[in-house]
Swiss-Prot record:
ATP binds at residues 90, 108-112, 504. Pfam families: P-loop_SecA, SecA_DEAD, SecA_PP_bind, SecA_SW. Signal peptide: none annotated. It comes from Microcystis aeruginosa (strain NIES-843 / IAM M-2473). Keywords: ATP-binding, Cell inner membrane, Cell membrane, Cytoplasm, Membrane, Nucleotide-binding, Protein transport, Thylakoid, Translocase, Translocation, Transport. GO terms for cellular component: cell envelope Sec protein transport complex; cytosol; plasma membrane-derived thylakoid membrane. This is Protein translocase subunit SecA. CDD domains: DEXDc_SecA, SF2_C_secA. It is a peripheral membrane protein. It is found in: Cell inner membrane; Cellular thylakoid membrane; Cytoplasm.
Amino acid sequence: MLKALLGDPNARKIKKFQPLVTEINLLEEDIKNLSDEELRSKTSEFKERLDKARNYDEREEILEEILPEAFAIVREAGIRVLGMRHFDVQLLGGMVLHKGQIAEMKTGEGKTLVATLPAYLNGLTGKGVHVVTVNDYLARRDAEWMGQVHRFLGLSVGLIQAGMSPEERKKNYACDITYTTNSELGFDYLRDNMATVMGEVVQRPFNYCVIDEVDSILIDEARTPLIISGPIDRPTEKYILAAEIAKQLVRQKVEDGPGDYEVNEKDRNVLMTDEGFKRAEELLGVTDLYDQENPWAHYISNAIRAKELQKKDVNYIVRSGEIVIVDEFTGRVLPGRRWGDGLHQAVEAKEGVEIQQETQTLATITYQNFFLLYPKLSGMTGTAKTEETELEKVYNLQVTIIPTNRVSRRQDLADVVYKNEQAKWNAVAEECQQMHEQGRPVLVGTTSVEKSEVLSLLLQGRNIPHNLLNARPENVERESEIVAQAGRAGAVTIATNMAGRGTDIILGGNSDYMARLKIREYLMPKLVMPEDDNLAFSLPSLGERNRPQGFAPGKKKKNWRASAEIFPTELPKEVENALKEAVKFAVDTHGTQSLPELEVEEKIAIAAEKAPTDDPVIQKLREVYKLIRKSYEDYTGKEHDEVVERGGLHVIGTERHESRRIDNQLRGRAGRQGDPGSTHFFLSLEDNLLRIFGGDRVAGLMDAFRVEEDMPIESGMLTRSLEGAQRKVETFYYDARKQVFEYDEVMNNQRRAIYAERRRVLEGMDLKEQVLQYAEKTMDEIVMAYVNPELPAEEWDLEKLISKSQEFVYLLADITAKDVEEMSVNDIKMFLHEEVRKAYEIKERQVDSIRAGLMRDAERYFILQQIDMLWREHLQAMEALRESIGLRGYGQKDPLIEYKQEGYEMFLEMMIDIRRNVVYSLFQFQPQGQPQAVASEQ
C-alpha cells in the first residue's frame, strides 16, 4: 500500500543516478577517439586534481566531480583490453558501490566487471583500494583478468594469496588496487598488530573496500571470529573419558521427563539435568564436576554437544584422520579451521581420531568489526534485500537493487510438501528422471553431504547418470569441471548448497572449460613433476557411466584424463596435431616433468584468459586453446539452443534453508541473463526447518485431511507459513548476531585503544617520556596505597612506602623513610618523581654503555612484551566473564550493562599492570657485559 502511494524507494534511488549514466554515455564518442596514450594520461590528470585535496571530504568531492569521465574511461579501457563493454546497469552498480552502498545484482550480471569502476576511481587517490573475494582462486582470477584494465590505465595492481611472504604482502598492499580474500585481509591486520618492529607491518591504513559476495562475509561469517592462537597444555585423556561418558548419558525426550540432559537445537546448546550431573559424577568417581582442582563440567558438556549437535557428514567430515569443518552455508570444507573452546577436541574424541592441542587466543576480531574499520565500505551480491535491516543497522550500508540487463524468464514453481523424507526423495528422483528424459539439465541442491549421497543412490537405482558435488575430497577436486558441464542437455548434478559460487552454469555446456580440460589432459602428464601422491585423481571409465564420478584414493599415479563424455566431440585431426605441437614446445622449453602442478595449472589458466603475456609457452597454448574452443563451440552452441527450447536449467531445492537468501542463491542459478529456466522446492515435515520451527501445525493439517505418505500437498498457505518460519529463523539469527555484535563492541573499543597504543610504541614516538610517566604514576599509586591524607602523618606507613618503591626501582636504595617524614602527600609524590627521573638517567647511562641506543630498544621491547602478554590474558578473562555474565539476568540485572562495566574495570586494571610491569622490567634489565659494580647494588 505504502509502495503504491510513495512509489518504490529503490526506483527513486536508481532514478537519482540516471543523469550520470546519460552523461557517461554522451562522453563515449569523444573518449573512443583518444589514443591509448591519451587515455592513460587521463589517470595522471585525475591524480593531479586529487593531490590538491587537503582532507577526506575534499577528496570525496573531487571524486564526485571526475566520476562521469573516469567511468567513461574505464568503460573504454574494458572494450580495448577485455573486449567487454560496461552496460548501463553496470555503470549504475559502479555508482552505488562508489557511494559506499551494497549493489544487489543477479547472478550472471557481470559483478566482476562492475567492481573495476569504483576500484579505478578510488584507486586514483593512491590511498589503496581492497577488492575482497571469498577464495584465493577468485582473487587471482580477478587480479589477472580485471587487473588488466587498471594496469592499462596506469594504476598498480596487487594480489594477496595464502602462503605469501611478508615482503610480498607489503609490496602488494602498497599497490593502488589490491585483490585479496577476507580471511587473508583480517589475519594480516591481526598479525600487523602483533608486529615487534615497524618493518613487519604489511598493511597501510584502510581506505576503501569492495566486497564481492558481501552477504556471505558480513552475515554468514559475521559471528565467526578470526583468531590467531598459540598452544596450551590440556590433558587429552579427559576428552576421551568425557566422550565415553557422553555415550552413556541419555537425552531427555520431553520437558521435565527422565533423562540426563536436554538439547536445545534452536540455540545449538545442551543443558545437563540434576540426574545427569549425579550420573556423570558417579561414572567419573568424583564428587563435584565443578571442582576447581579437577574440573570436568566443561569437558562433559562439550562431549554431549559433540554427540548431539555436531553431526558427521553434515557439520564436519573425517579426512585422513582429521576432523574437517563443513561450512553450513556453502557446503565447502574449511581445512585449517577449528572450533574453539575445546569443542573440536571433543569431536576428535568422539570420532576416535588423534586429539590435537587446545589453543589460547593471542589476537582476535570478528568480520563485523574488522570491516567497520574502513572509512568507506561497499559490496556486491545477488541476494541482500532480505537482510537489508541488518546491513543498515550494523554496517550502515544501504542496499540498492540494480535492474537486470535482460528481463528474467525464470519460472518459480510452488513448493510441494511430503509427510516424510523418504517420499520426498522418491519424488525428487522422479522429477530428475522426467527432466533427464526431456533433455533438460537439472541442478539439485542438498543441505548436507549425507543427503546428497541418499539421492545419488536413488538415481543410481534408476540408472540416471549424474555428478555429485559435495565436501568429500574426491568431489571437490572436480568442482569447477562438474559445474561447467551442469548445463549440458540432460545433465543431472547434485550439489551441496551450491558450493561452486563463482563458476557459471552455461546452457549447452561451457566450451571454454572443456578446452582447458583437453589441454590439461595432454600437457599435465608431460610437464608436471611426479609426486608420491596417495590422493590420486582417477576418473571412471565409460563402463561405469551411472556411478557418481569422483576420485579414488590409493592410486599412486595421477591421471589427468577427464571423463570422456565431458567432451561433445572428438577433436579434428589438425587441431589435435596443433595441441601436440604446443605440448612438445612446452616440454622442449621447460624439460619433461619439470614443473610443480600449480605452476602448470596457472599457465593453462592464463592461456585461457585474455591477460597479456610475454611467455612464449603460454602464447602457443593460447593459440591452440582458441582452436579447441572453436571446435567445441560448434556443438555446445547447437546444444545451447536445444536446451533453451526445452525450457533451460531446472533447479530443484530439497529443503528450505534457514535463510531465504540461500534459497534465492540456488534459484538464481536458473534463468541467467534472460535464459529460460525453472525452480521447484520439495520439502518434508521431517526437514530441520519445519521440525524446529513450526512443523506441528502443518502435520496436524495433513493428518486432518488424511494425506497419504507419498501424496504431496501444494498450497499458498503452506508456502506462506514456510516463509514465516524462515523469517522467524532469520530474526532469531539476526538477534544472535546483534548480541554478538553488542558484546563484541565492548571488546572492539578496547582492541582499538590497545592497538592504537601499540602502534604508537611501534612507530617509536618518544618512549622515554612515556616510561617516565609510567614510573611517576606507579610512584603515585604506591603513595596512595600507604598514605591516607585523612589520617595524621604519624599513622602513615612510610617504611612500607619506601620499601615498595625500592622493590620497583632498586636504584632508590639510598632513600629512607626519614627523607620524607616532614612532607605532605603531594610533596612525597614530587620527591619520588624527581628521584625516579634521576634513577632512570643512571639506568640509561648503564645500559647505553653496553651499546649506544640500547635503552630505546629496551623500552620498545618491554612495552610491547607487556602489552601482548597482558592483552592475551585479558582476552581470556573477558571470554570467561562473557560466559558467566548471562547468569546476572536472573538477578534482574542487564547482563550487557554488567559486562560493559566489569569489562571496562578489567581493562583499566590491565593498563595499570602494563605500566607497573614495564617500570619494574626496565629497572631490572641487566644486559650482558654490564659492569659488576652496578650489579652489586641490588
